[in-house]
UniProtKB/Swiss-Prot annotation:
Component of the Sec protein translocase complex. Heterotrimer consisting of SecY, SecE and SecG subunits. The heterotrimers can form oligomers, although 1 heterotrimer is thought to be able to translocate proteins. Interacts with SecDF, and other proteins may be involved. The channel interacts with SecA via subunit SecY. Subunit of the protein translocation channel SecYEG. Residues 30-53 are cytoplasmic. It is a multi-pass membrane protein. Belongs to the SecG family. The gene is secG. Residues 1-14, 64-67 are periplasmic. It is found in: Cell membrane. GO terms for cellular component: plasma membrane. This is Protein-export membrane protein SecG. GO terms for biological process: protein transport. It comes from Thermotoga maritima (strain ATCC 43589 / DSM 3109 / JCM 10099 / NBRC 100826 / MSB8). Keywords: Cell membrane, Membrane, Protein transport, Translocation, Transmembrane, Transmembrane helix, Transport.
Length: 67
């Protein structure tokens, strides 16, 4: 049963990350902030290596330091 919930949780997490990336790309197409470039110093400091890590750190950064 734990394995089932782990698989479901993973699928939901990946889907949410994908939805955030799609919304961020739509926002940048409309002339908003760029996707990752605004967080480049933070991401380099944290050594994010995959797109998923970069988007998670970007979300974390945006919630940690609101405008």
């Amino acid at each position: 049963m734990k394995t089932f919930f782990l698989i479901v949780h993973t699928i939901i997490s990946v889907a949410l990350i994908y939805m955030v990336q799609v919304q961020m790309s739509k926002f940048s197409e409309l002339g908003g902030a760029s996707e990752v470039e605004d967080f480049t110093p933070f991401l380099e400091e944290e050594k994010a290596s995959t797109p998923v890590e970069r988007s998670l750190l970007s979300c974390l950064y945006s919630f940690s330091f609101p405008a």
